[in-house]
Curated annotation (Swiss-Prot):
Localization of this protein: Cytoplasm
Species this protein is from: Photobacterium profundum (strain SS9)
One Gene Ontology molecular-function label: unfolded protein binding
Superkingdom assignment: Bacteria
HAMAP family the record matches: SecB
Keyword Cytoplasm among UniProt keywords: yes
Stretches assigned to coiled coil: none
Family that this chain belongs to: Belongs to the SecB family.
Name of the protein: Protein-export protein SecB
Cystine crosslinks: none
Free-text function comment from the UniProt entry: One of the proteins required for the normal export of preproteins out of the cell cytoplasm. It is a molecular chaperone that binds to a subset of precursor proteins, maintaining them in a translocation-competent state. It also specifically binds to its receptor SecA.
Primary location group: cytoplasm
Length: 157
């Protein structure tokens, strides 16, 4: 029991930097879109990627792509890559994977959401407030899909 407590005490997670890596806003049908009744269809795609920069130092990138259509036409497309540099130590591989695949993106999401909201308003469209994302559930789903894919490939071999 003391050994488990000691291992948890040695775990370390620090945010070194949160930064905007890439950004894009396109409104291909403006100003005509401003003349139409606003009934948007919002589609959110997201992805995360991580890589080790040095011993215990990781870059995590959260990519968000928001496509909003109105009357079957694209009103705007907004892409943001929100990055973070994190120092992580004292974690086993499964804990580290969760930290980089769920915990860190959860930290980055509010920054990306604010950037998207700001871009949309600057494009003079109605404000867009993205709902919170459950990165833990997405990560668990990813792990489950990976396990199923591994099982299928093992059965075929």
């Amino acid at each position: 029991m003391a050994e488990v407590a000691n291992n948890e005490a040695q775990q370390n997670f620090q945010i070194q930097r949160v930064f905007l890596k890439d950004i894009s806003f396109e409104a291909p049908n403006s100003p005509d879109m401003f003349q139409k009744e606003w009934n948007p269809d919002v589609k959110l795609d997201l992805d995360t990627q991580s890589r080790e920069l040095g011993e215990g130092v990781y870059e995590v990138i959260l990519r968000l792509t928001v496509t909003v259509k109105n009357a079957e036409e694209t009103a705007f497309l907004c892409e943001v890559q929100q990055g973070g540099i994190f120092t992580v130590s004292g974690m086993e591989a499964p804990q580290l994977a969760h930290c980089l695949g769920a915990f860190s993106p959860n930290i980055l999401f509010p920054y990306a959401r604010e950037t998207i909201s700001s871009l949309v308003v600057k494009g003079t469209f109605p404000q867009l407030n993205l709902a919170p994302v459950n990165f833990d559930a997405l990560f668990m789903n990813y792990l489950q899909n990976q396990a199923e894919a591994n099982t299928e490939s093992t059965e075929k071999a």
